[in-house]
Amino acid sequence: MPPVWNFITDFGDSAVTLPLALLVLIFLFAAGSRRLALAWMLAIGSCGAVIGALKILFGACGHELTFVHLTSPSGHTAMSTAVYGSLALLIGARLPLGQRRTILAATAIVIVGIAVSRVALHDHSRSEIALGFAVGVGAAALFRAALRRYAAPALPLGWLLIGGGVLVAVMHGTRWLIEPAVHRLALDFRLDLPFCR
């Protein structure tokens, strides 16, 4: 397997997305935008909670749901869509339409790249990618609704981008072993669910 897929997929690891989400949260609180900061926590937190719950639910079956090819929804895809997507919406909120579209398009390319890498590495099926993407889009939509209600603060975008870039560069390649922990938890919840058969 070409190493480029591992390089791309590492941008979606929780070791990158979660610290980046925390950095954005700090910037929002520092800018005095408490409501948007809370909305950010709700959006990213709900994404993590939902994808975690789905992983446990499907993992409790102990085998692939053959009719939809589902074993474990893609957390990389979900969190990448939520974090990178919401960050793009936040950065673009105070920019001209043309620049906003450019940022959203570039972000979409990154998210799609991460999603494709999960399939290329045989870590997830297309159905698992689609479900992860849907969860991430839901989280980003939640944050977008908050952006429409509360004005985006004048963040120091230069410092945010520098800080985010340094953080991603430092954490890229680090892998937090969340998936095995979720799998073990799923085994504890092994249930005889009708849709597992």
Please report, for each region that a protein language model flagged, where it lies by residue.
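Interfacial segments of alpha-helical transmembrane regions
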Residues: 26-46
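Hydrophobic alpha-helical transmembrane segments
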Residues: 12-29, 79
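Helical transmembrane-bundle signal
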Residues: 24, 48, 52, 111-115
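Membrane-embedded catalytic cores of phosphoryl/pyrophosphoryl-handling enzymes
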Residues: 34, 64-181
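Alpha-helical transmembrane segments in multi-pass membrane proteins
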Residues: 39-47, 51, 55, 132, ...
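N-terminal transmembrane-helix/juxtamembrane module of multi-pass inner/ER membrane proteins
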Residues: 1-20, 51-69, 174-197
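Short helix-capping/hinge motifs at transmembrane helix termini and TM-loop junctions
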Residues: 31, 58-59, 122
